[in-house]
């Protein structure tokens, strides 16, 4: 009975979310991300023979663009007549992945009931729900971050089981690569997860099994980093001429420039412009329009 009620509830929520997708207008940057994704998708499918459109997409070397490329791929299977709605639908699916991931993490740390409550709270959070469809970056990053953390938790618990260990190594690598492939410069956000893993292995020892192997952990960590890095640069064509130096170079250029600390170029009203060109009143205006 409980499963039936849960299924009806989830179905109703998904249908309502789909209805919201149809009601939303086009955000100022949605087509820019989509066209950028298409440009890189054509480059990848042509194995590099189709050159990137550097005239239209200036300064995009600072954006690794994994999600834009993957989103563009999925929209090819949906109606081109409703391209904006198709993009929003893909965003919606990744948003639900994020919420289900939060539920699973809560279940691991507490219990199944707490997991369900967390699911509902996150879903009905107006800030998150309002971004579920229209946000082409943040919800995907949240989903990747959450699932990376979840697979790390499962790895710590099940490392002694060889089959599960390989499974979680692969999925954590893909989740990490997806996160890095959206914004490599946001890598610092993973610091709490790394700190949690360090404390769990060497101090708390609550999740890990007695058979937990430090040696295997180090080997698996190296595998995760290599796979994640290769996944990231795959969707970052501007780095393909030197995948070891250019990602770091572009990231540093994006963080430090002649005007001080911060990205030299940002997306503003659908265009890539210099940070110094943004009006000083933009933050206040932006916050005003996000008020309930």
Please describe what each predicted stretch is.
Residues 19, 118, 168-183, 286:
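Membrane-interface alpha helices of multi-pass inner-membrane proteins
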Residues 41-46, 63-65, 69, 79-80, ...:
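Transmembrane-lumen/periplasm boundary regions of multi-pass, lipid-linked membrane glycan transferases
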Residues 4-9, 102-124, 143, 167:
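Transmembrane-helix signature of polytopic, membrane-embedded enzymes
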Residues 61, 65, 69, 79-97, ...:
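Loop-to-helix entry region of an early transmembrane alpha helix in multi-pass inner-membrane enzymes
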Residues 2-30, 38, 42-45, 179, ...:
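Transmembrane signal-anchor helices characteristic of membrane glycosylation enzymes that use polyprenol
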Residues 89-109, 147, 151:
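Transmembrane-helix motifs of polytopic, lipid-linked glycan transferases
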């Amino acid at each position: 009975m409980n499963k039936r009620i849960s299924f009806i509830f989830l179905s109703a929520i998904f249908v309502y979310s789909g209805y919201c997708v149809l009601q939303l207008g086009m955000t100022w940057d949605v087509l820019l991300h989509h066209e950028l994704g298409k440009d890189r998708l054509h480059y990848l499918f042509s194995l590099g023979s189709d050159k990137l459109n550097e005239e239209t997409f200036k300064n995009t070397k600072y954006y690794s663009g994994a999600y834009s490329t993957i989103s563009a791929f999925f929209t090819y299977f949906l109606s081109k007549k409703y391209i904006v709605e198709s993009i929003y639908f893909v965003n919606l699916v990744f948003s639900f992945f994020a919420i289900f991931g939060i539920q699973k993490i809560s279940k691991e740390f507490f219990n199944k009931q707490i997991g369900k409550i967390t699911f509902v709270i996150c879903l009905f959070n107006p800030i998150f729900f309002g971004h579920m469809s229209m946000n082409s970056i943040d919800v995907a990053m949240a989903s990747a971050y959450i699932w990376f953390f979840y697979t790390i938790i499962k790895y710590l618990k099940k490392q002694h089981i060889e089959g599960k260990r390989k499974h979680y190594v692969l999925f954590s690598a893909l989740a990490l690569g997806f996160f890095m492939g959206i914004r490599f410069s946001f890598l610092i956000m993973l610091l709490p997860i790394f700190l949690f893993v360090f404390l769990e292995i060497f101090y708390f020892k609550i999740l890990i099994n007695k058979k937990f192997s430090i040696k295997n952990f180090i080997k698996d960590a190296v595998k995760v980093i290599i796979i994640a890095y290769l996944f990231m640069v795959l969707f970052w064509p501007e780095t393909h001429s030197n995948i070891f130096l250019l990602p770091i170079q572009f990231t540093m250029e994006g963080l430090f420039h002649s005007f001080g600390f911060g990205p030299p170029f940002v997306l503003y009203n659908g265009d890539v412009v210099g940070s110094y060109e943004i009006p000083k009143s933009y933050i206040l205006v932006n916050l005003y329009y996000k008020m309930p």
